[in-house]
């Protein structure tokens, strides 16, 4: 009963919608065109292939909200190219900003647990998400410079305009979500549903790459991703309930107050260290239902 009631939330309805829209981007040819556009913009720079990977991840993350989906869609295409020209394998796997940039599954679950507004969470996430993306681009540039990785060619304005025309409809998809949520036209859940319908229209009518077989793949892929996220979350809520019944939360809060002598900075540092330690072994989706009820009231 606790397993089912843990995911019985309207807020969490946003997750499958964003998963479906991300899967539509992948199967409908939208992600491929976004990579081509980013490539025309950045591939001429030192470290251009890495920068393209980061930029495409940021755009894809603004639709799917899932790091796994972003790696499957973008990393599958860009990672082999990065390795081929000299990037190390471990470096190529570190460019996903999808969990940070809204609509993030992590933010949706955080809001569901704490009762905070998802819209406000998303608005707060855009600036750090963009900042981290820009920092990763700079790192890619200096990494390529240090390891003497070649340039990707010259900048051609015609190629940028041509690729922009190709991916215009694809770029509108994240814009619909961002503008719809930030302007208050729709809730995040409604924005996800609108993105699904729009992506389906673009994939079938505009790019003509979505057929019945691919739509089946979209639904199965989204169901698999959603099932993984929500199963982890549901199991963690049961674990959190046991913690509450046994009074572990009160004991943990008392311990924090005693160790920190009531200092807010020390409490924050202890919580950060605790979350960092647990995050080395567990997914954020599994950590939050256990940790947030303990530390959020503080």
Where do the PLM segments sit?
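Alpha-helical transmembrane segments of multi-pass membrane transport proteins
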Residues: 1-298
């Amino acid at each position: 009963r606790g397993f089912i009631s843990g995911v019985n939330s309207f807020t969490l309805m946003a997750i499958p919608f964003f998963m479906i829209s991300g899967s539509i981007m992948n199967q409908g040819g939208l992600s491929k065109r976004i990579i081509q556009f980013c490539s025309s913009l950045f591939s001429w720079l030192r470290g251009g292939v890495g920068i393209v990977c980061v930029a495409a991840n940021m755009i894809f993350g603004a639709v799917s909200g899932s790091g796994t989906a972003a790696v499957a869609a973008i990393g599958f295409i860009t990672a082999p190219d990065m390795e081929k020209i000299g990037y190390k394998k471990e470096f190529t796997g570190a460019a996903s900003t999808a969990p940070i940039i809204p609509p993030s599954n992590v933010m949706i679950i955080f809001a569901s647990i704490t009762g905070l507004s998802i819209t406000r969470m998303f608005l707060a996430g855009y600036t750090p998400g963009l900042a981290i993306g820009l920092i990763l681009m700079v790192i890619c540039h200096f990494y390529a410079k240090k390891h003497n990785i070649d340039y990707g060619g010259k900048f051609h304005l015609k190629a940028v305009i041509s690729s922009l025309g190709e991916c215009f409809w694809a770029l509108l998809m994240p814009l619909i979500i961002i503008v719809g949520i930030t302007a208050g036209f729709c809730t995040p859940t409604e924005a996800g549903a609108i993105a699904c319908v729009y992506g389906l229209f673009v994939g079938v009518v505009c790019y003509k790459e979505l057929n019945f077989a691919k739509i089946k793949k979209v639904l199965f892929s989204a169901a698999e991703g959603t099932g993984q996220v929500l199963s982890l979350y549901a199991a963690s809520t049961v674990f959190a309930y046991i913690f509450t019944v046994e009074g572990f939360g009160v004991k943990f809060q008392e311990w924090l107050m005693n160790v920190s002598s009531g200092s807010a900075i020390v409490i924050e540092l202890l919580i950060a260290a605790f979350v960092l330690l647990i995050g080395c072994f567990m997914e954020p989706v599994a950590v939050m239902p256990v940790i947030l009820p303990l530390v959020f009231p503080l």
